[in-house]
């Protein structure tokens, strides 16, 4: 059988038209996904018609590919990847980085397949351990050139089939469609935020962590709080609002019949392009100032704060060590150190770490080396994960997992799931946390956790207000 290859064409397209057409096309599809960099990135990716869906939970992975249903046991990512490798292609260097492949997520709880620790917390949401949609046909918007790449896959030199498929994709994206029908939830389901982790419970957990730190178990632990609220608007409306309220580098909207994901993450877990590996840890947070002067003063205080600097350096070292597991010896380097990045409601300290992939390692090895990100667990990573399992009342599910893609061309990119809403059963769930160290004050860490959720809460509130006005 001839080897598969990507085929593509580029057409002029306006950014607003891309988002409007995606929303119109998505209305009639049960599964669809949009990956965007609403802050400085070059490409946005739309997937509308997956050739396969992949779900892994509790050691069983289900792959639905056309009329075929496969069931595999064991590590769900390895099970999926063993099947996915049969679809792989070589890179076409004229095309965008993502040229087709799998888009989806790894939940935080996927870490249980990498590190062996006890399952103590409640799995109340039953979020899949992994979930992916596999796309042969994709649309990639190039913000730099204001053009739309349409990409499909064919066998070998079959240009005739490629031309037909690309013509169909072009017609789909250029055809004038009716305006989007409002997809509202029942108004009576709207409600206020509820958090099962009370301030007293959180404070007790912080004190317990400080005991672990004092006894030498760990240096720092990220402790989080989950909130929930009944939904009164469709999740995609919330996503549209979030991208305006808090544009971020690693945004995502994923819709399935069972759940929807609204992600505004600022943080990269890992990317691979050719042999180049990158991770971009974030550690250190302050609120934005109300004036330029206050903003600069807060940024200056953050970057010179000894506690924040020490925590950041520790986590950069952790990420260097993780990346070093799969990198050529001597290739790991920090090419950007302790920069300030500002978002709508908060600012962060950010660094960038690079390495060169060692021969013999594949995509699963890369994920196993770095997942979950150390900035959202703590250090040392495995012991902090055991403590999180002991102290947080429910499983994290999607929170602090990763959303992203595995390309047919062996490349990959995954974020860290923060600033994210997981919608299911008419409820919106969001989670945020704070890094606890030896001198942490419980009430301050409690407030910081809620501060990080403000952009998500604001997006929900504005979406509801807009629906009422209509």
UniProtKB/Swiss-Prot annotation:
GO terms for biological process: folic acid biosynthetic process; L-tryptophan biosynthetic process; tetrahydrofolate biosynthetic process. Disruption phenotype: Requires p-aminobenzoic acid but not tryptophan for growth. It comes from the Bacteria. The keyword Zinc does not apply. Pathway: Cofactor biosynthesis; tetrahydrofolate biosynthesis; 4-aminobenzoate from chorismate: step 1/2. Its cofactor is Mg(2+). Part of a heterodimeric complex that catalyzes the two-step biosynthesis of 4-amino-4-deoxychorismate (ADC), a precursor of p-aminobenzoate (PABA) and tetrahydrofolate. In the first step, a glutamine amidotransferase (PabA) generates ammonia as a substrate that, along with chorismate, is used in the second step, catalyzed by aminodeoxychorismate synthase (PabB) to produce ADC. The catalytically active amino acid residue K274 of E.coli enzyme is missing and corresponds to A283 in B.subtilis. It is postulated that the enzymatic mechanism for the PABA biosynthesis in B.subtilis proceeds without covalent intermediate. First, ammonia is added at C2 of chorismate with concomitant loss of the C4 hydroxy group, yielding 2-amino-2-deoxyisochorismate (ADIC). The second step is the addition of a second molecule ammonia to C4 of ADIC with concomitant loss of the C2 amino group, yielding ADC. Both steps are catalyzed by ADCS. This is Aminodeoxychorismate synthase component 1. The gene is pabB.
